[in-house]
Amino acid sequence: KIFNYLTMIKNTGYDFKRNYYSNGDIIYTPEVRYNVPASNEVNLLMSQNDETLRAVVISDTHIGSEKERLDLLEDTYNYCISKGIHVIFNCGDIIDNISNPGKVDSEDRVNYLLNNYPFDKSILNFIVLGNHDISPLKVYGQNLMTILNNYRHDLVTIGYCEGLINVKNEAIVLSHPYIDCSLNANKQSKIVFYGHSHFYKIKNFLSQVRY
């Protein structure tokens, strides 16, 4: 029975360490890993005849905060549906820091995200997680990446801080830089989308295009 209980708990974003003892006991203790992989990658497949990737880029939705704009997120989905766009790149801080006061209590913020982030069966979100998104892990030991991977398959997490999306022979980096973060993947791509800054700009930098 303990394995079933542990699996149920792990599905909600918690992890456990197995401690083995010479008397044959196995003791399970909560494990908080702050050094979660900073970089990950995923392959976004396209047909051979399709030469153009159409996507929308968003960032810093801070769901659960007093200033959240779920209406604009719904507008984004409606725009994608009307234009036949099936991919959204989300550059992090999808939720607000659970230590911050907000319209939703801190312990309910992750469930609020799961229930209120829009869904359409034809739209995928590729998400790099930011400094606000790591707050459930730091405060409760609850990994948002695990939760989204288990309960929202349309919200594809590709790492904390940065992640790499391979598209045919090219690579796209989503980045949300913060202090406890080492940037490596952005050296592998000509296109980098940044979150965290809360303003829009385009910059050419050493043959890279940064947004």
Predicted regions and their residues:
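Acidic, histidine-bearing metal-coordination/catalytic regions of metal-dependent phosphoesterases
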Residues: 1-57
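Short acidic low-complexity segments
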Residues: 156-166
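Flexible, charged surface loops at secondary-structure boundaries
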Residues: 48-51, 80-84, 119-122, 166-167, ...
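Conserved beta-sheet core of the metallophosphoesterase superfamily
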Residues: 1, 171-211
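Core catalytic region of metal-dependent phosphoesterases/phosphodiesterases
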Residues: 41-43, 63-157
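Active-site glycine-centered loops adjacent to acidic/histidine catalytic or metal-binding residues
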Residues: 60, 92-93, 130, 176, ...
